[in-house]
Amino acid sequence: MKRYYITITGTEFRHGSEFMKEGMKVKLVKEPDNEYDKEAIKVTLTPIDTVGYVANSVKTVIGECASAGRLYDKFGAETEATIMYVLPDGVIAYVDGEEVLVRDILK
């Protein structure tokens, strides 16, 4: 089964990424009413709320990570991801929601 890796970007506009650690779970929540990006997926962490967004631009996606656009139709309203690396240019995480993997199998 394919594992999806994502870049979490925009942390510098919120709470930074210094508190993020390897293994930390975050929630990915679709934001269809986002005025800037109809495929926006915000990244939340309880109790902080929004800590960033899944990168959706060639300028912000690191390496072979999936963009928000590639990931958007792979899950329902929300799913979870696990942080792998905290880098100067972004945070790398993998999506661990089972529904993402099931939707790929059914295609």
Language-model segments: which ranges?
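Conserved active-site motif detector
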Residues: 1-107
